[in-house]
Amino acid sequence: MLPPFFLKRYIMKYDAVIFDLDGTLTDTLEDLKNSVNYALSEFGFPERSLEEVRSFVGNGVKKLIYLSVPESTSEETAEKCLEVFKTYYKEHSLVKTKPYDGILPMLCELRNRGVKTAVVTNKMQEAAKDIVRIFFDGFIDVTVGQVDGVAQKPQPDGINYVLQKLGVSKDKAVYVGDSEVDCFTAKNAGIPCIGVTWGFRDKSVLLESGADFIVDTPEEILK
């Protein structure tokens, strides 16, 4: 990792910037929490708090639900709960979800500079594409969510796929995310990671997980 005095100030010189979605470009936490609690209530399970759901996200919806149901829940019931969640979230993924402040101007500036952009997320593919289409149409070149044949983060498959699609080498790319999963994904792909502090994890988690840079605002990504 770079020395601490480099963490806040650096010059970005990349041909491609790849973003995580939840907690990085968009604040999806309320919709995720409400969908989780709807699914839990269908099985008579206790609800989860916003902070609990915050700590559970990052590894895909299956892990989210498996962490949300009571520990004694059978795999069969957990899978049924997962399906209820998927169905409900598909219809309610955009109720409160919105881009974080400063994201759209940052993406616009990247586009003006000719920088290619992509999203690699563990979110369900259809939901990810819907969010990108609604909020970032024209600003994201490739979106890869949870799809068959592409291993989820922290495996590097998604990053490798978009780099091939964009025609960009690893030494000209950077990954931007808000969690330890994102840091590990970038490391596994062999590219640097910019950790953002406005998402679902604390700055200390990002540093411990090996983030190469830390930014507190979207504007800092442009420096």
What are these regions (language model features)?
Residues 34-38, 63-67, 84, 105, ...:
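Alpha-helical elements of Rossmann-like donor-binding domains used by nucleotide-donor carbohydrate transfer enzymes
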Residues 36, 103-133:
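Substrate-recognition element of Asp-dependent hydrolases with the DxDx(T/V) motif
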Residues 27, 48-52, 56-59, 73-76, ...:
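Residues at secondary-structure transition points
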Residues 66-105, 113:
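Metal-dependent phosphoesterase signature
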Residues 2-11:
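Short, Lys/Arg-enriched N-terminal segments with co-localized hydrophobic residues
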Residues 10-55, 66:
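Active-site neighborhood of HAD-like aspartate-dependent phosphohydrolases
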Residues 10-15, 51, 111, 125, ...:
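Asp-based, Mg2+/Mn2+-dependent phosphohydrolase catalytic module
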